[in-house]
Structure formats: C-alpha cells, structure tokens
Amino acid sequence: MNILITGATGFVGQALCRELVNIYRFQTIFAAIRPENSTTSLPLPIKPIIINSLRDLSENQEVLAQLDCIIHLAARVHQMRDTTPDPLAAFRAINTTATAQLAQAAAQVGVKRFIYLSSIKVNGEHTRPGQPFTAKDIPHPQDPYGISKAEAEIQLRQIGDRTGLEVVIIRPPLIYGPGVKANFHSLMTWVDRGLPLPLGAIPNRRSLVALPNLVDLMITCLTHPAAPNQTFLVSDNHDLSTPELLKTMARALGKPSRLIPIPIPWLQALTTLVGKPNLAQRLCSSLQVDIRPTQHRLGWTPPVSISDAMAITAQDFQRQKNRPKGSPQFNP
C-alpha cells in the first residue's frame, strides 16, 4: 500500500509517521511538507514531497497516481488571537476549498481512500450532562475553524458519492501527548510550577484523546473494510473533570496538585478581571463524545490508558523544559 500524509511535520503528523514506519511495511510512504519544514527529520524510508501549498499537491498527478490512500492532517488550526481581517475566509481557503480540491484530484487518478482529520468542533463547543456528542448529531460549529471543518466534511462526502472515493472522517476532541502545545501545555506548566489553581470545584466532564490512541485509530482506518464512508468520534474512553485532569497531570509530573475550590461565578469574575472572559467557559464546561459506534464498527478500543499517556506526555514536557536553549529538539 502506498500512502501520503499531509501535515507530516505537525504534532499529529510526526507521531503518525513514526508509527507507520515502526509497525507497517508499506511499499512507499510520502510526506507532503512545506519548504520551511524541510529540515524536520522524518523517519526513513518516508519520502518527502516539498510543496508550497496544497494546490501544488493537488496538481501533482505523478505522485497522486501512485497512491492508495491519503491521510489529510494539514490544516489552518484554531488560533486564540486571530488578527486576520476575515478569519472564516482564511479557514475556508485551506480547510475547506484546498481539502476538497485535493480529494477531487485524488479521486480522478484512482486513489482509493481519503482519511480526513476533522474536529469535534464540528459538533459544537460543549455538551449537556448525559448527552455526549455523536457522529449522527446535526453539526453545530461555533467558530470559523469549526465551520470550515464542517463544510469540508460535506464536500468530501459529496466527492465520495460522485467518484467512489472512500472517505473516512475522524473527529477528535482535545489531543494531548509528547510535543503538545497551547492550552494543555499551559496547564502542565502551571501544575509543574506548583501554582495554586482556583479550579478545585469544577464538576464538568471532558473527553480527551491521547496522541497514540488517535494514531492507532487512523492506522486502523487505513485498511479496515468497515471504515469507508463513515465518521468516527474518538477519545480515551475515560472522561475527566478539570480537577481530575490536573491531579492526573500532577501525578505524572511528580508534583503536588494545589487546587483551591472556589465557586464557579467567582472563577468567571476572576478570568474576566484578567482579560480572559472565555477562559472560565473552556475550563468549566463539559465536552463528552460517545465512541461506542467507533468501537463497535471497527472492533477498536483505545490501546493506551490516560495514566500511561499522561506519563509519556509529562516525560516529554520535562525533557523539553530541561533542554538547553538553542539545542535541537528531538521527538523520540
């Protein structure tokens, strides 16, 4: 089987490349990367394809014609401080239009399967108690990123219906693992410093997915006969409250968890005072996903527990923290 990975030098892409090389003996694995990422080391025998944009890849029929499957990870990602004049147009250009163009070009030259890493933001931003998101829910994206992903899903399904391209859509919630950045990294930094956190009284439930579990599902979908033309939600199948998450982090880091229980309205007022009114919503709301259909259809279960996944995440966090400034990064 010949496959191509877009976004191969990203957080998810690097982990996927390593696992593909370690476990599977594909004839050829291509990785589409941008020139500025060309120095990022990829495991052998992955073959890099340098592209300036996804359009370059869509027009490269010589490469596409060799492929059995594309795993499409490349995307314009969610940004907390987006200064783009028209964020929705910027997200659509890459996440919707360029994705559809790539899938259409792939279908025209006979690529069999197209695995698309979407987002749980297609479903929405939060769930009510006892009502986890499912793949059958009516999409309700709340921001430009989620809208662009939802529209891409629609176009991919239409392309699949017209051409016979086997489309597989995966919607992950928050992904964590070695190399994680953004909010999850910030939480780990706070816990590692032993800072008292006013988050001890939050009764929410949140689904997460460890990077190795997400990678395992994507690899399962490469060849599984029941995967085509399906949408799969994924998680660790072990939902946590925010206090439970922080305690799990603390154990993995070998640090005490200093959680102060304060009423949620106080927390909301506090985050507003520091200029981050939406932070309390993200910390206090619930977001749960139902992965039972994924498990039943694919016979799949997350292979790595939350405690083990958090341990390897913490080990990488400590390694990066202790790395001398200016030295090259290496993700084992």
Where are these regions (language model features)?
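Glycine-rich Rossmann NAD(P)(H)-binding loop
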Residues: G177, L199-N204, F232-D239, A250-G254, ...
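Substrate-positioning beta->alpha
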Residues: V180-S186, G200-T223, N229-L233
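N-terminal Rossmann NAD(P)H-binding glycine-rich loop of SDR-like oxidoreductase domains
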Residues: I3-Y24
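Conserved C-terminal active-site "lid" loop/helix of NAD(P)H-dependent oxidoreductases
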Residues: L211, L270-T301
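NAD(P)H-binding glycine-rich loop region in Rossmannoid oxidoreductase-like domains
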Residues: I51-T97, Q101, A105-Q108, E125
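Active-site Tyr-X1-5-Lys
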Residues: H140-V168
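Mid/C-terminal beta-alpha module of Rossmann-like enzyme folds, strongest
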Residues: T220, H224-L279, S307, A311-A314, ...
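Conserved Rossmann-fold NAD(P)-dependent oxidoreductase catalytic core, especially the SDR/UDP-sugar
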Residues: A100-P144
